[in-house]
């Protein structure tokens, strides 16, 4: 296989992906670098990216609006899966990577490129997600990974870029590395590399501090149909608008901040700061409506598989047979997950204060009550307990 001459680069506008453009041309002999930036709802951040790529030497600069598929095809399945990596991180950044990689491959096919490239470094998770996804979708395409191979320090990378007129967005005054999409923000590097250092308020952008959040609680109703959130406070919304509304409501009350130590795929621990107000709110509400509408054995099994689903996505296996099989289980489990969850937002907390399902609630008040309306047959308990505990009694008879 000869050297790739036409390459589509996953472009973010940051230092590494900007430096990749001249580096691919000079060091790899690539003749045409096509920069592709994904619009995932990050807003104004994309305004200057197109021209920035051209200034860095790209032959063409493309921006793809992926907000709708990002929310509908990636975020909403994660909500139905209650996806929390290591029980805490809702995959706000990880969910975007297979979508970007998929579009990278599609553009390469459309433009007859013979390679694709990314600017991920050798220490992060994203290199794994891009490489595994591209390998699964297009094993014939050449994959170029200059930032993993060039061996330059951060300072050397910046200096290399400056020779080509690339101005770094990070300075000593703003030393943080930030990734942003509609699901939230991830912040790392700088002072945050000390896991005992409290993050300053300046690192947060979409959640209020507790001090600045409202002094009165807010009650919010979230309606689910087949496990999908479809309305907030009685107002039906399409998925993108619903995520925006959930972000606004939860973020205003200071909910959705995470400060965690996370185990990366490559084997190292990292300190990560996340803001994911809407996604965490919706997952919490979804867990609650499931508790009302699903039987115990299905809940227990789904709980175990949810962690596996989150692990697969975090580790780059969105397009894998096991992930697809788990999707089938989760899709079936959501057929009766219908109803409304009521939450109270206040000072960084979300408390579930009510839940109801007109058609699918498994909570039967006549069976659960301790009042005079009680229809539970108490006499049946004795025989049930005898049979239920029989293995323990047999064990005791034989061994004690």
Swiss-Prot record:
GO terms for biological process: argininosuccinate metabolic process; L-arginine biosynthetic process; urea cycle. Pfam families: Arginosuc_syn_C, Arginosuc_synth. L-citrulline binds at residues 89, 125, 129, 177, 186, 262, 274. Keywords: Amino-acid biosynthesis, Arginine biosynthesis, ATP-binding, Cytoplasm, Ligase, Nucleotide-binding. Disulfide bonds: none annotated. One of its GO terms (cellular component) is cytoplasm. Its EC number is 6.3.4.5. Gene3D superfamilies: Argininosuccinate synthetase, chain A, domain 2 (3.90.1260.10), HUPs (3.40.50.620), Single helix bin (1.20.5.470). L-aspartate binds at residues 121, 125-126. ATP binds at residues 10-18, 38, 119. It is found in: Cytoplasm. InterPro entries: Arginosuc_syn_C, Arginosuc_syn_N, Arginosuc_synth, Arginosuc_synth_CS, Arginosuc_synth_type_1_subfam, AS_cat/multimer_dom_body, Rossmann-like_a/b/a_fold. Signal peptide: none annotated. Pathway: Amino-acid biosynthesis; L-arginine biosynthesis; L-arginine from L-ornithine and carbamoyl phosphate: step 2/3. One of its GO terms (molecular function) is argininosuccinate synthase activity. It catalyses: L-citrulline + L-aspartate + ATP = 2-(N(omega)-L-arginino)succinate + AMP + diphosphate + H(+). It comes from the Bacteria. Homotetramer. Belongs to the argininosuccinate synthase family. Type 1 subfamily. This is Argininosuccinate synthase. It comes from Prochlorococcus marinus (strain NATL1A).
